């Protein structure tokens, strides 16, 4: 139930008690800051610059402007994104690969391995809607290659029944999965693969599993 009530809060008086810092301590702290900056900048310098991105795009038959934003946003994960696009080019799926990348957040671009993206790209009907079916992400879960797993594990008869009537998938999730809210701490979920294997989930993981299964079946 929702409710509200007035609260009158008086914040405590500020009484900061900062320690004295000697000139030598300040100098050492500055040295450490500079060292940290140099390490970070050296790492950033390994990211592909615009000419390298343009050359990569040409090598896979794509327009530089189409891939530059994704590669820049992927930062230290650029090799994985480029590998994904390279594989898509070999299979003639560059346009579809870009549609998939467009569904991802910048954090996903920085975190997701090429193999996970490939699993979703190559195991989804080419005519399926990108935002509602091709997209790997459901909520705030870690992205996994659940699509090929569920397509392989869900019995053919069940898959056919779920496609004919998606409400049967709803009923299966309700009746076949045991709710175990104590399994997940705040902001963690069970992967769709884990839910299938264990037949147990908290409510959010069950919801994610349902969407993952529906997408895997092309619903």
Name every feature range the model reports, one short phrase each.
Residues 1-182, 189-197, 215-217:
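N-terminal accessory/pre-domain segments preceding catalytic cores
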Residues 210, 218-219:
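Hydrophobic transmembrane alpha-helix bundles
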Residues 197-207, 213:
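A conserved hydrophobic secondary-structure block that centers on an alpha-helix together
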């Amino acid at each position: 139930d929702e409710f509200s009530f007035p609260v009158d809060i008086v914040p405590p008086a500020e009484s900061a008690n900062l320690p004295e810092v000697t000139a030598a301590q300040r100098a050492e702290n500055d040295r450490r800051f500079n060292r940290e900056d140099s390490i970070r900048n050296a790492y950033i310098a390994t990211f592909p610059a615009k000419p390298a991105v343009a050359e990569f795009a040409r090598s896979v038959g794509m327009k530089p402007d189409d891939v530059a934003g994704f590669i820049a946003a992927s930062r230290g994960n650029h090799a994985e994104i480029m590998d994904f696009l390279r594989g898509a080019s070999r299979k003639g799926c560059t346009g579809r690969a870009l549609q998939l990348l467009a569904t991802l957040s910048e954090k996903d671009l920085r975190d997701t391995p090429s193999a996970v993206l490939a699993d979703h790209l190559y195991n989804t009907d080419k005519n399926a809607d990108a935002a509602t079916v091709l997209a790997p992400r459901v909520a705030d879960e870690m992205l996994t290659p659940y699509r090929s797993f569920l397509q392989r594990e869900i019995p053919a008869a069940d898959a056919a029944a779920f496609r004919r009537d998606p409400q049967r998938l709803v009923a299966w999730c309700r009746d076949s999965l045991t709710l175990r809210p104590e399994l997940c701490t705040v902001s963690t979920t069970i992967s769709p693969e884990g839910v299938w294997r264990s037949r147990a989930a908290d409510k959010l993981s069950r919801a994610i599993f349902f969407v993952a299964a529906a997408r895997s079946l092309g619903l």
